[in-house]
């Protein structure tokens, strides 16, 4: 029964037109000279979807939802199907590509072009290319062996070549075609094809016939021809089962043969006699789509059905009838359900089974089915509906062409291993390119030219003061290169004649020999190289890293855990990435080692896994200009080593976010931390740039992938942590003895604290007080004071109280850390002085005694200044249950730490001892004046209750007290927190009673202070003068808040202004004349008199006070004020 020919329809303008079915067979896809790909749901579809791919489309292929096209822009492009979205440019030619095909599983493509080249490349990684050279004229067509071992190509030079893909060698050259100088002048485009699945034959159109060549012997074993063909055959196409071959000729004839019988089954003539330029079999049905050179599209149905419907002459029983029904059936939807089995009866001779055996490789045992007891129950073997029947012999799938019959048995092979990434050099373009970048880094650019005219290497420096440009003849065929400010390093692969070589051009050498070369051992191939500061390194196929000095001295050898992928260096650092195992499901399994090769050699990263994006590979590896390791994967994610978080990797930029199109990429050439930028080259429709014209470098900003980056909170968080990460390199540089920009570090810290304060204010507005406390953890002491002030002004007193407690803890930690630092420094200095000029023999002086020595020395130097503070602390410890002291390291450490802490918080000018006084200033008044400096911030954090009515029983306990920084106060009932959470004691009853009498109301107490002419601090004088302005701006503040506001304003004064107020306070004693001074008792005498001690023993009383510790100094001062008032 002849095939049914549908009426042809217009598809594209006049010119070469290509056609194929998609994998499911639901769509017809065509391309033509108008540069469009059209997707047809059927031949009658009046509104096909169009995808524009260029000016003209010469060829295309469709597989696994991807369309690869050869357009007039000389590029092989990839698009998604059926969306038609661009998915990248796989490769480029210098002229038009004439034919492009997929392999069987869709992982590779092959393309032949007019520049005589055939390229084979991976779809997922276009950098893995193989170039087949040998044709001397434009390539007409290419075809993959279904086993992916061979590739066949036809050319205008009159030859058909069979290539072995793995080693890019030509296995055979078949001079079968007529020669011509261009594709347009060729009598036939010679679309050859391999037999599906087995690949046993390759069909080649030769004149008016089709030659079949054997795969193994590459000899012509059969020639298919027919008198119906009067012009040269243009194209051949195999049925998916491999049993039928169809050919289209230049004069519009379509002929189909049965390969087993060599019989011609179909003869169809084009209605207008136009040239047939494309043929495609339906994957499931007996249909063939074809196009002509006028852009028309046609369809043939029921192709070769006459061959399968002849009854078998061998079998006549009922069982055989059922058997034939099982495999033949009348299910027309699955064309080869009956086709592949029934074709044997087409020829009634005894060689049927032999022919079938020759094609399948295994005879079918029909007796096994006939002898089965239940074989007569044939309907039980049929599947429900129109599904495919179960075929007992699984080898029949090699004969049955369509996937519906191939296997009913389901199986899972487990995760598929990912091919390992090949070694590469960072900043280089693929090796197969004739003009390529061997390296592009922060020092210079190395280009390689490898064509018929020249094979050379050019070295160009960004800064010509380093060295002038260098031109080298690439006689050794170097493929790897690196450049630094000291040398140029080159390496070549091993060949049959020469060993792999490492060549170094040491242009910074002071002698006349500026070049050296070393050969690798036999069989060892260099795969990666890099240049460090004073050393070079190369990684070889023997899983070794060889270290040389820059002058050529062999140094360390390092064994790798797996094959190297890439290597980079910066100064003394060397980073190596290698395969630590087999990856699965498209993922690479890479490990990384980071070594420091300076004087103190150490390994920082010990083969840790290298994190990559899903289904990606490493595309760039190196260091920032400041020396931090970083890398980029194929998805455009840039990651940096975060040394402050246990040497972890953090993503800092996504270059794909800046690409305009899906096929665009950025080719990274360098990264800087100050300023924060990625230097890269934009590549439109490709992954790497061409060498000419010279590409322009673009700059991309860093952007950490934080959540809610569009909100104000997310932006500030991202800015804070980005600044934190990129200011860490200064610590690393200073630790290793490099110069670092202190201004940069200060500016970064300033910006971080500003961001923290902004986030703190935002959280306060949102009533997120717990979040405010979390943000305060990162604040410095000064910024935390601002936060306390902001919280107080925002009427968030609980938050301010908690911030005060946190400030105490942080100050305590800071003081403790500084004290330990001083102890370590003094310990080192003490021992170095003892052993200066002598041997290092161990003695008792070498024991760890730094802590008591430090404490004794500190107490000896500061005994007089700290005397009054010690008495108050001891009194508090005796009269009250001790509070947890964060400074408590030993018996006397709290006193030392308390005094140091006061110094830290009272001044921003370094660690100055505010208690340092001369011997003539040891009066109680001055001692109390000194103690005031530690109590000002203490009183800032207190929020006293409002005084109750006069005469109430609670007046003595909760009465509003004037905040006097000169003396410590007793705790109120609720024990509110202070900024300085130091140990406070409950005073004895006598002291409390006298205090009540001495300070009944704030105005009177102030008058007493003025009357007694007690010395004031500079801050008190300033506060007295500026108190009205503070109250006018902030009405309703109580005394504690006034002092806090005053303290913040006083700190804003310059150091000179503060010093003036201090000097003014020291000179504010005159107010009494000499006579009054003689008449009036001295404060020490008043203290002794009020305590019942004789006046003449004042000095001895002071000495006795040291021993017996009667009362604190603050109590004595208040008692003296009380005694004077009573007079």
From Swiss-Prot:
This protein's UniProt keywords: Cytoplasm, DNA-binding, Nucleus, Repeat, WD repeat
UniProt GO molecular function: chromatin binding; DNA binding
SUPFAM superfamilies, per the entry: HMG-box, WD40 repeat-like
Biased composition (Basic and acidic residues): 846-857
Domain of life: Eukaryota
Disordered: region residues: 811-1013, 1064-1127
Chain residues forming the annotated DNA-binding region: 1013-1076
Biased composition (Polar residues): 881-891, 918-937, 1087-1100
Any one GO biological process: DNA-templated DNA replication
Keyword Nucleus on entry: yes
Biased composition annotated in UniProt, kind: Acidic residues: 819-829, 858-877
Low complexity composition-biased segments: 948-960
Presence of the UniProt keyword Transport in the record: no
InterPro entries: HMG-box_WDHD1 (IPR055339), HMG_box_dom (IPR009071), HMG_box_dom_sf (IPR036910), WD40/YVTN_repeat-like_dom_sf (IPR015943), WD40_repeat_CS (IPR019775), WD40_repeat_dom_sf (IPR036322), WD40_rpt (IPR001680), WDHD1/CFT4_beta-prop_2nd (IPR022100)
Any one GO CC term of the record: nucleoplasm
Renumbered ranges of WD repeats: 11-50, 52-91, 92-131, 134-173, 184-223, 228-267, 271-310
Summary of the tissues where the protein is detected: Found in oocytes and in various other cells.
Subcellular location, record wording: Nucleus, Nucleoplasm; Cytoplasm
Quaternary state and interactors: Homodimer.
Task of the protein: Core replisome component that acts as a replication initiation factor. Binds directly to the CMG complex and functions as a hub to recruit additional proteins to the replication fork.
Protein name, entry field: WD repeat and HMG-box DNA-binding protein 1
Organism listed in the record: Xenopus laevis
Lineage, top ranks: Eukaryota, Metazoa, Chordata, Craniata, Vertebrata
Gene name, Swiss-Prot/TrEMBL: wdhd1
């Amino acid at each position: 029964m002849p095939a049914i020919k549908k009426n042809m329809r217009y598809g594209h303008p006049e010119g070469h037109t290509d056609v194929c079915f998609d994998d499911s067979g639901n769509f017809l896809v065509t391309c033509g000279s108008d540069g469009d790909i059209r997707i047809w749901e059927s031949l009658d579809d009046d509104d096909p979807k169009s995808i524009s791919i260029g000016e003209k489309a010469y060829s295309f292929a469709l597989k696994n939802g991807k369309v690869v096209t050869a357009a007039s822009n000389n590029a092989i492009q990839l698009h998604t199907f059926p969306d038609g979205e661009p998915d990248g440019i796989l490769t480029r030619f210098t002229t038009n590509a004439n034919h492009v095909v997929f392999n069987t599983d869709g992982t590779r493509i092959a393309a032949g072009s007019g520049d005589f080249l055939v390229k084979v490349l991976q779809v997922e990684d276009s950098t893995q290319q193989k170039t087949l050279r040998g044709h001397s004229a434009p390539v007409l067509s290419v075809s993959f062996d279904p086993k992916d071992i061979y590739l066949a190509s036809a050319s205008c030079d009159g030859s058909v070549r069979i290539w072995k893909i793995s080693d890019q060698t030509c296995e055979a050259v078949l001079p079968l075609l007529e020669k011509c100088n261009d594709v347009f002048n060729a009598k036939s485009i010679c679309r050859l094809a391999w037999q599906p699945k087995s690949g046993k034959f390759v069909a080649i159109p030769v004149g008016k016939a089709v030659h079949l060549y054997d795969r193994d012997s590459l000899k012509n074993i059969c020639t298919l021809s027919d008198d119906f063909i009067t012009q040269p055959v243009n194209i051949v196409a195999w049925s998916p089962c491999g049993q039928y071959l169809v050919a289209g000729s230049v004069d519009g004839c379509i002929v189909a043969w049965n390969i087993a019988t060599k019989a011609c089954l179909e003869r169809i003539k084009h209605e207008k006699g136009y040239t047939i330029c494309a043929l495609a079999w339906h994957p499931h049905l007996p249909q063939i789509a074809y196009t002509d050179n006028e852009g028309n599209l046609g369809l043939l149905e029921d192709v070769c059905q006459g061959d399968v419907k002849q009854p078998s002459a061998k079998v006549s029983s009922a069982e055989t009838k059922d058997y034939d029904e099982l495999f033949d059936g009348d299910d027309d939807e699955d064309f080869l359900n009956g086709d592949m089995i029934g074709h044997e009866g087409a020829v009634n001779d005894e060689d049927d089974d032999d022919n079938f055996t020759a094609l399948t490789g295994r005879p079918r045992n029909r007796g096994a089915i006939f002898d089965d007891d239940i074989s007569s129950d044939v309907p039980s073997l049929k599947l429900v509906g129109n599904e495919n029947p179960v075929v007992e012999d699984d080898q029949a799938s090699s004969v049955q062409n369509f996937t519906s019959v191939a296997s009913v048995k389901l199986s899972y092979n487990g995760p598929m291993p990912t091919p390992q990434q090949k070694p590469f050099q960072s900043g280089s373009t693929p090796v197969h390119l004739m003009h390529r970048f061997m390296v592009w880094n922060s020092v210079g650019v190395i280009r390689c030219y490898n064509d018929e005219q020249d094979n050379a290497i050019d070295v160009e420096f960004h800064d010509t003061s380093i060295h002038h440009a260098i031109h080298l003849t690439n006689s050794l065929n170097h493929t790897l290169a690196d450049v630094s400010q000291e040398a140029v390093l080159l390496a070549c692969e091993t060949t049959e004649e020469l060993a792999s070589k490492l060549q170094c051009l040491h242009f910074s050498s002071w002698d006349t020999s500026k070049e050296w070369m070393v050969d690798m051992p036999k069989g060892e191939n260099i795969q990666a190289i890099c240049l460090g500061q004073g050393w070079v390194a190369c990684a070889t196929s023997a899983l070794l890293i060889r270290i040389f000095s820059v002058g050529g001295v062999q140094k360390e050898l390092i064994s790798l855990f797996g094959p190297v992928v890439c290597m980079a260096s910066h100064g003394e650092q060397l980073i190596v990435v290698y395969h630590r195992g087999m990856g699965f499901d498209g993922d690479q399994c890479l490990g990384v080692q980071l070594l420091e090769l300076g004087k103190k050699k150490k390994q920082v990263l010990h083969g840790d896994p290298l994190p990559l994006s899903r289904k990606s590979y490493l595309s760039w590896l190196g260091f920032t200009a400041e020396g931090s390791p970083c890398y980029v994967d194929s998805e455009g994610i840039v990651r940096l080593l975060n040394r402050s978080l246990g040497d972890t990797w953090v993503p800092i930029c996504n270059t794909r976010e800046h690409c305009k199109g899906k096929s665009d990429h950025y080719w990274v050439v360098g990264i800087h931390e100050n300023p924060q930028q990625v230097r890269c080259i934009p590549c439109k429709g490709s992954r790497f740039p061409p060498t000419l014209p010279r590409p322009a470098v673009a700059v991309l900003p860093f952007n950490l992938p934080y959540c809610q980056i569009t909100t104000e909170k997310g932006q500030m968080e991202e800015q804070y942590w980005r600044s934190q990460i990129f200011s860490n390199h200064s610590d690393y540089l200073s630790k290793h003895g490099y110069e670092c920009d202190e201004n940069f570090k200060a500016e970064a810290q300033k910006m971080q604290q500003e961001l923290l304060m902004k986030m703190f204010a935002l959280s306060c507005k949102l009533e997120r007080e717990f979040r405010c406390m979390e943000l305060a953890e990162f604040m410095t002491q000064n910024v935390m004071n601002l936060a306390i002030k902001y919280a107080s002004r925002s009427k968030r007193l609980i938050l301010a109280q908690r911030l005060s407690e946190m400030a105490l803890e942080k100050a305590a930690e800071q003081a403790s850390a500084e004290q330990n630092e001083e102890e370590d420094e003094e310990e080192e200095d003490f021992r170095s002085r003892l052993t200066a000029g002598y041997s290092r023999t161990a003695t008792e002086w070498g024991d760890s005694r730094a802590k008591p020595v430090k404490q004794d020395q500190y107490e000896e130097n500061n005994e007089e200044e700290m005397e009054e503070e010690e008495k108050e602390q001891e009194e508090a410890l005796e009269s009250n249950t001790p509070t947890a002291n964060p400074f408590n390291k030993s018996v006397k450490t709290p006193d030392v730490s308390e005094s140091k802490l006061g110094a830290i918080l009272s001044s921003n000018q370094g660690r100055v001892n505010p208690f340092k006084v001369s011997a003539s200033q040891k009066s109680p008044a001055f001692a109390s004046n000194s103690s005031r400096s530690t109590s000002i911030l203490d009183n800032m954090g207190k929020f006293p209750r409002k005084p109750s009515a006069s005469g109430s029983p609670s007046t003595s306990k909760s009465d509003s007290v004037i905040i006097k920084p000169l003396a410590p106060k007793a705790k109120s009932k609720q024990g509110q927190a202070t900024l300085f959470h130091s140990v406070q004691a409950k005073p004895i009853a006598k002291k409390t009673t006298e205090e009540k009498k001495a300070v009944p109301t704030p105005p009177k107490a102030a008058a007493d202070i003025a009357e007694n002419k007690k010395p004031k601090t500079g801050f008190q004088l300033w506060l007295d003068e500026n108190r009205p302005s503070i109250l006018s701006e902030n009405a309703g503040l109580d005394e504690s808040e006034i002092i806090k506001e005053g303290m913040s304003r006083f700190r804003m004064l310059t150091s000179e202004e503060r010093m003036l107020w201090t000097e003014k306070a020291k000179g504010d004693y005159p107010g009494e004349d000499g006579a009054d001074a003689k008449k009036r008792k001295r404060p020490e005498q008043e203290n002794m008199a009020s305590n019942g001690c004789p006046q003449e023993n004042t000095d001895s009383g002071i000495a006795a006070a040291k021993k017996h510790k009667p009362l604190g100094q603050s109590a004595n001062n208040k008692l003296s004020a009380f005694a004077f008032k009573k007079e």
